[in-house]
Design a protein with these regions (language model features):
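Glycine-rich phosphate-binding loops at beta-strand->alpha-helix junctions
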Residues: 118, 318-340
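Conserved non-catalytic scaffold segment of RNase H-like nuclease domains
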Residues: 45-85
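Non-transmembrane, aqueous-exposed alpha-helical and coiled segments at domain scale
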Residues: 4-6, 99, 105-106, 248, ...
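Conserved ATP-utilizing enzyme core subdomain
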Residues: 16, 30-49, 54-57, 204-302, ...
Length: 398
């Protein structure tokens, strides 16, 4: 037997595993590294976050990824070169963290790598009938495994698409394991580049997980254009200095994506600076000030989250919303959400013992655990649009 397969077999039979979860989002702020101790699988899973760190990306790393990110026309050679290069950068960060934490690589059972999303193309967006849903994350798992000496699970989204999903959001598979509570309706709201939420009913209703529209992506892109060297609107200072323009806000809300039924997925391929410019032209607000533009797109992100949650809740008047992702650090965005969802109680996932900045990396560690230890019945959620699959490709160090 291949020794890697024998080791994997042994790992699957252990009561618990030490797994590193990695998340690198579209904001390109850095690599989230979550060292997790995970016992059991499925609804019997117990997770403890042992260590967590976000390693900031260099300007060189950001620029290299932005050369190919979310663009229809790119340098194919550069894409080919970036696939292993990103893995080697991530491997170096992992090795450095383990050394800093005084943990041997051999003490880690698995790495769960989301990779770096380069393009997300659900059929609803590309609208080419002979092609289905598609997505591409680069950062090759074999290179990561060899450079760290740790079995690596990667490329999770492809199996979801192969089984009939849209490849995103995948949060539901971990959310229902970690956060479901019988008798209590909960929403797990993640505000990353794109905002998404998982509705976890306390009773017999269907679980729902869906993207709802832009989270930080439009705001961050606009800030980077207007203030080179700046990644985001720190403390919402620029947005707070402006006034919402109702004409531009209305134009931003006109896209057909918002009329489509849940679950659905989207990305910066739609919500980008071109989208903003088109909305400005439609609303005759091309000369709108930077501050007023930021105030408006901040409100736009908030409104689409609010509308989606209200649509999901129907006649429910009180619910707990556990928030995570970079958007929770945007005070104006969170203020809008709380003002327009007055019946909801807003909490951080920290209230459940999960660092909100680490949540996505933790969720991929859970997916890796399911890939190795679970069968389909353990990951079955029995809700429309959520395929019952264990996801991830396995790479051995040697």
């Amino acid at each position: 037997m291949n020794p890697g397969i024998q080791k994997l077999y042994n790992l699957a039979g252990k009561p618990g595993r030490i797994i590193i979860g990695l998340m690198s989002g579209t904001s390109l702020d850095g690599l989230d590294i979550a060292l997790c101790k995970i016992e059991g699988c499925g609804q019997n899973t117990k997770m403890e976050l042992l260590k967590f760190e976000t390693i900031s990306y260099t300007d060189d790393f950001k620029n290299e990824v932005r050369n190919v990110f979310s663009k229809k026309q790119i340098d194919l050679e550069k894409l080919c070169l970036l696939n292993p290069w990103i893995s080697l950068q991530h491997a170096g960060m992992i090795n450095d963290c383990l050394q800093k934490w005084n943990i041997k690589n051999s003490e880690v059972d698995l790495i769960a790598s989301h990779g770096q999303t380069i393009y997300h193309a659900p059929q609803r967006l590309h609208q080419q009938q002979k092609f289905g849903n598609a997505t591409l994350q680069i950062g090759d798992g074999d290179h990561l495994a060899v450079a760290t000496g740790i079995i690596t699970i990667s490329d999770f989204r492809q199996k979801n698409i192969a089984a009939g999903g849209e490849g995103a959001p995948l949060a539901v598979y971990g959310d229902h394991i970690l956060f479901s509570k019988k008798g209590e309706d909960r929403i797990l709201l993640n505000i990353g580049g794109i905002a998404n939420f998982t509705f976890l009913p306390g009773g017999d209703e269907n679980i729902l997980c869906t993207d709802v529209g832009p989270g930080n992506t439009l705001m961050d892109a606009y800030m980077q254009e207007k203030f080179p060297g700046t990644s985001f609107d720190h403390e919402s200072l620029v947005a707070k200095a402006g006034t919402v323009n109702e004409n531009l806000l209305a134009a931003l809300k006109e896209d057909d994506f918002f009329k489509q039924n849940f679950p659905k997925t989207t990305g910066p391929e739609l919500f980008n600076l071109h989208y903003l410019q088109q909305a400005k032209q439609k609303s005759d607000t091309v000369s709108l000030s930077t501050e007023d533009t930021m105030a408006t797109i901040n409100r736009f992100s908030a409104d689409m989250i609010v509308i989606a949650i209200k649509d999901c809740l129907k006649d429910k008047t009180e619910i707990k919303i556990f928030s995570s992702g970079g958007g929770i650090h945007n005070p104006l965005l969170m203020q809008h959400l709380q003002e327009h969802l007055p019946g909801c109680t807003f909490l951080s996932t920290a209230e459940t013992g999960v660092n909100p900045d680490a949540k996505e990396a933790v969720l991929f560690a859970l997916l890796a655990n399911e890939c190795v230890c679970s069968d389909v019945s353990a990951v079955e959620i029995k809700s429309p649009g959520i395929p019952a699959v264990a996801m991830g490709k396995i790479s051995f160090p040697a």
